[in-house]
Amino acid sequence: MKNETIQYRTAPTPIVAKAPEQRQAQGGQMVLTGYAAVFNEPTSLGRFNEVITPEAFEAANMEDVRFLIDHTGVPLGRTSAGTMELTTDARGLRYRVTLPETARARELYEAVRRGDISQSSFAFRIGREDWEQVEGRLTRFVRSISVVLDASAVTFPAYEQTTVEALPFG
């Protein structure tokens, strides 16, 4: 039986920003990059721990993923629009998003640059999971994700090991 429940995960990501005037003078864009998910890092979700396994994203649909703030609001990037890219490597699910020239995007960029927002998350639907007792604690191993719905810069992440940073302009 397929679980259609949307799962949200958040993680830390540092961002660096310049004022809009400096960006325009340098011809730069506001770009954030980071890890929305990390592999093989257990996190506590209350009554159980969770681990995202390296194979979890192999068959995931990532064709129309939105970049959000705290999993809500107007998208600030989107894979289907070509403004966000998602890749996986040995560490986890990495994103790179080019932010629009909007007040909300500038506020996010500055908050990340200052370190006020330093983590990320992702929303997904599970394709396959296994449950085990690990060191006396019930642990869910996410083996397959059917679809990734969003990657978000967040205030309160589930995974402390996630990252985000602002790339320099120019």
Please annotate each region the language model reported:
Residues 1-61:
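Polar/acidic, low-complexity leader/linker segments enriched in S/T/G and N/D
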Residues 40, 74, 101-102:
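Short, surface-exposed beta-strand-loop junctions and turns on beta-sheet-rich folds
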